[in-house]
Amino acid sequence: MNGADFKGSDIRGCDFGQAQLVGANFERARTGQTRRQVFLPLVVAGAFALALAYGLSQMVFGALGQTPEQSAWMSVVMLHIFSGLAGVGSASSALFGWGGRVGRAGIYLSGVCSAALTGFFYLGSYFDQNLKAAIAGAVAGAGLAVVFSLIAKKPMGVIIPAMGAIAAYGFSFLVWTAAIAHLSARQYIWGVGLGALSLVYVWFAICSLQAVGRGVSQLIGTSFRGANLTNAQFDQGNLKNTDFSKAIGR
C-alpha cells in the first residue's frame, strides 16, 4: 500500500499492522474506535459483572446469620476474603493506574479474586452446595483470570474493574450488616469502625466504575503497529486511540 491515498477517510478500527505505507497520505484521516469496539467490551464486561452480581447476591444473603459453628461458615469466610481483596485490588488499580507495580498487582489480584468468587458460586451450586466442588471452581476461575489477563490485557482493563466494582459493593453490604449488628448490641467502637470500612468500599466501587470508562477509552482503535510509515502524511489527522508502537517513521 505504498503511496496509498487515505485523505479524509474514516479508518477507525482498521488494522495496518506490519503494512508497507511508504508515502501514504492520511491527511485529515479519522482514526480511533468504532462503535462496535466501544460497546463490545462494555457488553462483555456487563455480562461478567451480572454473573458475579447474581452469584455474590446469593452468597451474601446466604451468609447473613451464619455462625462459626455451622457447616457453611467456611464459605462465609471465603466470601469475605475474596470480595474484600477483589474490591481493594480494583480500586488500587483505578487509583494508581496500570503503569506502576501497585496498579498491576491490584488488577491481577482483583481479577483472580473476582473470578474465584464466580467459580466458587456456580460450580458449588451445580454440585448441590458441595464445598470441594466450590473450591475447585474457585481455583479454575482464578486460573482462567490469570490466563486472560496475560493474553487480553486491554479488554481485561474493562472487565476486571466492572467485576471489582460489584465485589466491592458486595463486601460493603456484608460489612454494613455487621456494623448494624454491633451497633444494635451497643458495641459502638466495632459498629462505627465497620460502618466506616463499609463506606470506604462504596468509594472503592465508585473508583472501579470510573476505571471502566477509562479502560474503554484506552482500547486501541486503529493500529499501525510495526508498519512502515516512512514519509507518510498525517497532516490535520484526528489521531485518537491509535497504536504506532514499533512503527517505522521518517
PLM region descriptions:
Residues 76-82, 131-139:
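Structural signature of hydrophobic alpha-helical transmembrane segments
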Residues 98-105, 155-156:
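Membrane-interface helix-boundary motifs at transmembrane edges
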Residues 83-91, 139-145, 200-201:
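Hydrophobic cores of alpha-helical transmembrane segments in multi-pass inner/ER membrane proteins
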Residues 108-109:
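Interfacial transmembrane-helix boundary/kink motif in multi-pass membrane proteins
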Residues 40-101, 114-117:
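Core alpha-helical transmembrane segments of integral membrane proteins
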Residues 1-58, 67, 114-123, 131, ...:
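Tandem repeat scaffolds
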